[in-house]
């Protein structure tokens, strides 16, 4: 029993001794162990303190020397690629001694350089249009030089901000409202402000943010002012919303009619002289209008109104031409001795001849109460086409 215990203790001591020998060999062949006697073992020639090596750096430094001894002509980049692949293929148990060595170096680095703090170099983002000086390179710049370049870039950006925030000159914006010159100015200011945001690297960040907020507020106010200036007037709206009725008659009683009963809405433009415009209103089914006094209707305008009503009533079909006997009855005077009503229309014959048209119509129809008499309204309400199919074919 005692012999078995001694043998077990000897077997348990074997791996420890093996690990100690491996670590001793590693420390002997490690290049870092030879340089630790120097107080400046982790400093460069320029006085820069290097970072402590990690496990991969410790391992790759040893393996790189071996590869360089075997193949001295191999490129450094190729050696690094091979070392990276080999490190990934290593087992975790094989990485343990290098991890321990890296931890030892880290603790020694902390003891030798207690005030060390990792400060990576910040390369200032330069404007692509600005060319760097030939005498200065970003790699050789000291920390003080980097701050100077950042301040100079901040000054340039402040100049750009001032140029963007300044209001435009009165002579610069001479284009009319329809050419969208104001939009180009707003977009240009936004582009300048975006460039300024990209190249700001000064320490006074709060002041820069306040300047940016003021710049955005000014741009927004200018855009609102331009939108108010570019609002279309009533004359511009008439160009798109109204339709002109050609050869419209003189409507003396159009102002006296109500808005609900009228199909068209009269709009007169101030710049158009005496031209008359109409815009469509809601068309609803209504009964026959109440009798109104006849308006002045010239004989030449009645065929035109019948033509228009026929086109709208028939949905694009050819209009019904009035009969010759109706045309002969138009010049007659309805009231005897009326000098002022010389052009009034006597529609008694029209009412008699077109009774057949008004018998079968009880639906909706277009109404012209501004200048239509009840007889003419009943005539318009009638069917314009015969029921026979042969009558639908028109020959010209």
Swiss-Prot record:
Location in the cell: Nucleus
Tissues expressed in: Low level expression is seen in undifferentiated proliferating cells of the neural epithelium. Greater expression is seen in the maturing neurons after they leave the neural epithelium. Also expressed in the embryonic gut epithelium and adrenal medulla.
Gene3D superfamilies per the UniProt record, alphabetical: High mobility group box domain
GO molecular function, one term: RNA polymerase II cis-regulatory region sequence-specific DNA binding
Residue segments, region Disordered: 1-22, 116-180, 203-261
Keyword annotations of the record: Activator, Developmental protein, Differentiation, DNA-binding, Neurogenesis, Nucleus, Transcription, Transcription regulation
GO process annotations (BP): brain development; camera-type eye morphogenesis; negative regulation of transcription by RNA polymerase II; neuron differentiation; positive regulation of canonical Wnt signaling pathway; positive regulation of transcription by RNA polymerase II
Principal location class: nucleus
Stretches with biased composition (Low complexity): 160-175
UniProt KW Transcription regulation keyword: yes
Bias type Acidic residues, positions: 203-214, 223-232
Portion annotated as DNA-binding: 49-117
Keyword Mitochondrion: no
GO cellular component terms listed in the entry, alphabetical order: nucleus
Superkingdom: Eukaryota
PANTHER family: SOX TRANSCRIPTION FACTOR, TRANSCRIPTION FACTOR SOX-11
Protein's job: Transcription factor that acts as a transcriptional activator. May function as a switch in neuronal development.
Protein name: Transcription factor SOX-11
